[in-house]
Swiss-Prot record:
GO terms for biological process: amino acid biosynthetic process; aromatic amino acid family biosynthetic process; chorismate biosynthetic process. It comes from the Bacteria. Pfam families: EPSP_synthase. The lineage of its organism: Bacteria, Pseudomonadati, Pseudomonadota, Betaproteobacteria, Burkholderiales. The gene is aroA. This is 3-phosphoshikimate 1-carboxyvinyltransferase. It is an enzyme of class 2 (transferase). It is found in: Cytoplasm. Pathway: Metabolic intermediate biosynthesis; chorismate biosynthesis; chorismate from D-erythrose 4-phosphate and phosphoenolpyruvate: step 6/7. It catalyses: 3-phosphoshikimate + phosphoenolpyruvate = 5-O-(1-carboxyvinyl)-3-phosphoshikimate + phosphate.
Length: 463
């Protein structure tokens, strides 16, 4: 009997009250775990994100001989082994689709005295890693591709123009190299800033320009305690929901190191109002379109911006979002396709122009095993459209792939049920339980946030 994907009806919200404390950022979480492992001493990390990416990094570090206590309620203790204290793993390290684990680990393992094979799920094998590998090879590392040239999986035997993780990996492993590392042509500079700011481990860095960084060779002393700031990308979904009025969203201040913390300014241009030192947005009416923007520095929040623009009056065009093509899915194609299916007018090209959704009261959105897609396409329910997320099952080629979608912010369920007093708590609990159950073909239903239930309209979600 074929596996039946359930639907989860969410009731509309007329009043929303509560206080949100954001979970940690995915990129900062994994950078901090790796730096803690390579440090000398014990590092207590607080504010850690509970996600598939973080679990991939934690499992890999444990296989490499690092003792880690937790995580428990966003807190874990990492017993650092030093730059050369990692041990040969018992087998290949499977990292799923966690680019924030694959690239930094590739660099950190390049000068270890043992061979390591890094593998991932099918999507990982489509995400290029050749720039990092080329840079490491120039520094003397011996790395072999096991399948397609330039892509994982790879065996390590011992910059950042497409994805910031390329330079991130080099920045992290720089102390193990004999020379300073320089890289240019950055497309995601805010993510580079994250790495530079997550170095209270005693590593001096200099940001000469937006094109050149230099990191001096030195050891990593542990900072003892490392508190991670909240995830600005996760905040963007709540901030974009017109039905969530005056709900404080804390964990990210005005001086956040994350590029996506720019998102409230974009919303102000569209008619929202922010106040206070934390990210609090109080919509003062229907969102309206704003001027064009270069969204390359906020590739994740740009997805939320594009979806919100499709619900606004007029059109908006987030431009130069090149990094979308090499994320968890080809997000440029996915966003264009799904916005078009929802009734928006999509202009082909490197940019994306969203126009108000029209003419449909119900539509299906494919999340393509990408949690960011699932989060974004819950927003159209604010416009009176019931949305059903089919996960991967509608297309045979997708159904044959075994891959989890629930990767980034599972804490959103706790926010919806507890912090915001969600009237659809029962449905969300059922959905959260379903997320942990593997379907017949190994697929897991996509993570769907509370946003579809906001304001006057209900969203119906399902596998």
């Amino acid at each position: 009997m074929a596996f039946q994907w359930p639907r989860f009806p969410l009731q509309p919200w007329r009043h929303v009250t509560g206080h949100l404390r954001l979970p940690g950022d995915k990129s900062i979480s994994n950078r901090s775990l790796l730096l803690g492992a390579l440090a000398e001493g014990v590092t207590e990390v607080t504010g850690l994100l509970d996600s598939d990416d973080a679990r991939a990094m934690l499992n890999a570090l444990r296989d490499l001989g690092v003792v880690i206590e937790g995580p428990h309620q966003g807190r874990c203790t990492v017993h650092g082994v030093g730059l050369h204290g990692l041990k040969a793993p018992p087998g290949p390290l499977f990292l799923g689709n966690a680019g924030t684990a694959m690239r930094p680990l590739s660099a950190a393992l390049a000068l270890q005295p043992f061979d390591t094979t890094l593998t991932g799920d099918p999507r990982m094998s489509e995400r290029p890693i050749n720039r990092l590998v080329d840079a490491l090879r120039e520094m003397g590392a011996v790395i072999e591709y096991l399948a397609q040239e330039g892509y994982p999986p790879l065996t390590i035997r011992g910059g950042g123009s497409v994805s910031s993780q390329f330079l991130t990996a080099l920045l992290m492993t720089a102390p193990m190299a004999s020379a300073q590392i320089k890289s240019g042509l950055l497309l995601s500079k805010p993510y580079i800033d994250i790495t530079l700011n997550v170095m209270p481990f005693g590593v001096p860095t200099r940001d000469h320009t937006e094109r050149i960084f230099a990191v001096s060779a030195i050891r990593y002393p542990s900072p003892a305690v490392l508190r991670l700031e909240g995830d600005a990308t996760s905040a963007s979904y709540f901030l974009a929901a017109a039905g969530i009025k005056g709900v404080p969203v804390t964990g990210i201040g005005r001086h956040s190191m994350q590029g996506d913390s720019w998102f409230p300014r974009a919303l102000r241009r569209m008619g929202a109002r922010s106040c206070g030192s934390s990210m609090i947005v109080c919509p003062r009416g229907e969102l309206r379109a704003a001027v064009r923007s270069d969204s390359n520095s906020i590739p994740d929040a740009a997805m939320t911006l594009a979806t919100x623009x499709a619900l606004a009056r007029g059109g908006r065009r987030p431009r130069t979002i090149f990094a979308w093509r090499v994320k968890e899915t080809d997000r440029l194609y996915a966003m264009s396709t799904e916005l078009g299916a929802a009734g928006a007018r999509v202009v082909p090209g490197a940019g994306l122009r969203g126009c108000p959704l029209r003419g449909r009261s119900y539509y299906v959105a494919r999340c393509r095993r990408d949690s960011r897609m699932a989060m974004c396409f819950s927003l159209p329910a604010h416009g009176g459209r019931a949305v059903r997320h089919p996960g991967s099952r509608l297309h045979r080629q997708d159904a044959e792939l075994s891959s989890k979608v629930v990767r980034s912010v599972p804490e959103v369920w706790g926010m919806a049920i507890t912090a915001l007093r969600c009237p659809s708590g029962g449905a969300l609990r059922a959905m959260a339980r379903f997320e942990s159950m593997t379907g017949q073909r190994g697929d897991v239903v996509s993570q769907l946030p509370l946003l579809g239930a906001a304001r006057r309209h209900a969203g119906t979600f399902g596998g």
